[in-house]
Amino acid sequence: KDEAGLTAMRGLYYLSRMSEEVANVQASVDIPALRRALADLSSRYRDRYPRSEEFTNRINAFEKQAEALFTAALTKQDPKALVAMPDLVQSWRALQRDVLLANPLLDFERILYVKRKGSEGLTANWQGNDRLHGRRFDNEIAAFDLRAADNETTIYRPENPMFVGDVDLHWDGKRMLFSTNGTVCEIGTDGTGLRKVITETDSYDPCYLPDGRVLFMSNSGHHAVPCVSGGDFVGNLHLANADGTGIRRLCFDQDNNWNPTVLENGRVLYARWEYTDSAHYFSRLLMHMNPDGTSQMEYYGSNSYWPNSMFYA
């Protein structure tokens, strides 16, 4: 209960906290896992992964450094070792990034994504993204350099707080389609060349076709989902020229279509709500068709109990 006792108690507390922090760092530094990843990349890609020896040496050197610091902190209770922990963590993360991002399959430089705060911007599983139009969102289309930290770039941010999403990157990697508040737009990956492509009714969820035309969803039919008493309009697949002209409806389904994407064989994969031949009513089947809308048929999911819904085909 005196000053000396209080000082001793503080010392024990600080030692306990230091030991806990060091143990957390030690648990996060999984060197065997990184060695396994390096061995897999080296054996799998061989000449396409030329820095294997360099990374092995760096891992060995880091392991010695980490063991020395952990010993000093946990056995000798060296305060300097605790101070060095943040730098050790940064070195570990840099080593992980270098080893894993040298994967030859990661042969691109930037990641394109939608950044959204507050709300995920998700609908119920039977609805289309037209249900998001008119709602307030704090979101933008952005990109960052895969191999550089803190290098985020805003490509498009709407002037008003409205939905932006449904991004589809062009084959050349220089432009993209996206939807915002019922309009399909196109913009360059550098943020230039913004233009409206489809402005008819509620249009969203676009997809480039190899011949230059565009697929997209539209509720132009003005029919609605029957099991919610017509409370949600149905979006079906439509086709248009690159400039938005020549719009033609391809699907005439009772309920929504979603997420068109081009398969390697040139056909279009998409999802469709289906009441027929269904094991239960949560039914988003994968369908495929020719780009002109012909030969629509099931791809996967008819009479399959699990998974009961498929998203983002």
Locate each region found by the language model.
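Beta-propeller blade signature
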Residues: 139-145, 186-190, 232-244, 283-294
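Glycine- and acidic/polar-rich repeat regions and solenoidal domains
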Residues: 268-280, 284-286, 293-313
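Multi-bladed beta-propeller domains
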Residues: 149-162, 188-202, 241-255, 290-309
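Short, conserved, GDST-rich strand-edge loop motifs in beta-rich repeat architectures
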Residues: 113-136, 216-233, 270-284
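Conserved beta-propeller blade repeats
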Residues: 111, 161-171, 176, 202-213, ...
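Asp-box/WD-like beta-propeller blade repeats and closely related beta-sheet repeat scaffolds
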Residues: 183-239, 243-258
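Long amphipathic alpha-helical scaffold segments
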Residues: 2-20, 46-154, 161
